[in-house]
From Swiss-Prot:
HAMAP family: QueC (MF_01633)
Record pathway: Purine metabolism; 7-cyano-7-deazaguanine biosynthesis
Similarity section: Belongs to the QueC family.
Function description: Catalyzes the ATP-dependent conversion of 7-carboxy-7-deazaguanine (CDG) to 7-cyano-7-deazaguanine (preQ(0)).
NCBIfam families, A to Z: 7-cyano-7-deazaguanine synthase QueC (TIGR00364)
Gene for this chain: queC
Protein's name according to its UniProt entry: 7-cyano-7-deazaguanine synthase
Top EC group: ligase
Amino acid sequence: MKKAVVLLSGGMDSAAVIALAQEQGFAVHALSVRYGQRHTSELDAAARVAAAQGVVAHKVVDVDLRSIGGSALTADIDVPEAGGAGIPVTYVPARNTIMLSLALGWAEVVGANDLFCGVNAVDYSGYPDCRPEFVRAFEVLANLATKAGVEGAGLRVHAPLQFLSKADIVRAGVRLGVDFGLTVSCYNADADGRACGHCDACRLRAAGFADAGVPDPTHYAISS
């Protein structure tokens, strides 16, 4: 069976990506990164999703981006309750580049020629590393910078959610049997994984379920 490495954050998008990769016949190796994020709830969620969706392997890699800082997700910066103009403070400098690089390295080790990530250019909150140009550029880099790219069958970077709305992602996940109740999207989730209901991630998630006409399984710490 062909293999793929899928970035798994523990959120709803990456859970849907795993299901989409499996639908395409890939044996999924899921990679999560402990990068110093504000809470560990999403990594707990990643473990639940990996187990529920039957991945071949789930690896958690430690790369502490708190030593760099520069983001509300890794430093002592307040997370805003509403989106604004420009790139938001929840942008983590070069995060997707770093994570895809880790996935690329593991893909070479396990013999996978395909990488999957959950970046989205529709409801993407303004992050520069969620744009189609970034995904295309990283695929070029992957094939220039690796043994697998130079001597092997080549590497492909898939972003199957790239042009889907959150509602489309919800519908795709429901069709494929994804249990979104296992996932955590909130920037301010508590130790039990309960969402704040007010941050940008919560807003996009709630709107996705509402627009899809699907009951929201999110566990909230307070009424949203």
